[in-house]
Amino acid sequence: MALTKADIAETLSDKFGFNKRESKELVEQFYDEMSEVLVKGEQIKLSGFGNFELKDKSARPGRNPRTGEDVPISARRVVTFKPGQKLRAQIDNYGTA
């Protein structure tokens, strides 16, 4: 199961009493803010959860796995996520209780 924006908005509505429209707008604003920060090349640090960061990957040679043909892989920017200690601990301990 995947957690969607709609799921997050519904949880906000249920737990905090926001109406559906308000909770959807709040989630959209949060995603927009995160996107804007990353596009500017800045980090997002969510305490206890983890960090999102934009990294530049340089061009490099690659290979088509079907044909074995050499193919250039162009330079690009990627978003990376590094989980925080609390999240790592929760994941490590999942199902062991």
Swiss-Prot record:
Gene Ontology BP, a term: regulation of translation
Cytoplasm keyword on record: no
Gene3D superfamilies per the UniProt record, alphabetical: IHF-like DNA-binding proteins (4.10.520.10)
Pfam families: Bac_DNA_binding (PF00216)
An annotated Gene Ontology molecular function: DNA binding
Cystine crosslinks: none
InterPro entries: Hist_DNA-bd, Histone-like_DNA-bd_CS, IHF-like_DNA-bd_dom_sf, IHF_alpha
Keywords of the record: DNA recombination, DNA-binding, Transcription, Transcription regulation, Translation regulation
GO cellular component: cytosol
Function comment: This protein is one of the two subunits of integration host factor, a specific DNA-binding protein that functions in genetic recombination as well as in transcriptional and translational control.
Family: Belongs to the bacterial histone-like protein family.
Subunit annotation: Heterodimer of an alpha and a beta chain.
NCBIfam families hit by this protein: himA, PRK00285.1
Name of protein: Integration host factor subunit alpha
High-level lineage: Bacteria, Pseudomonadati, Pseudomonadota, Gammaproteobacteria, Thiotrichales
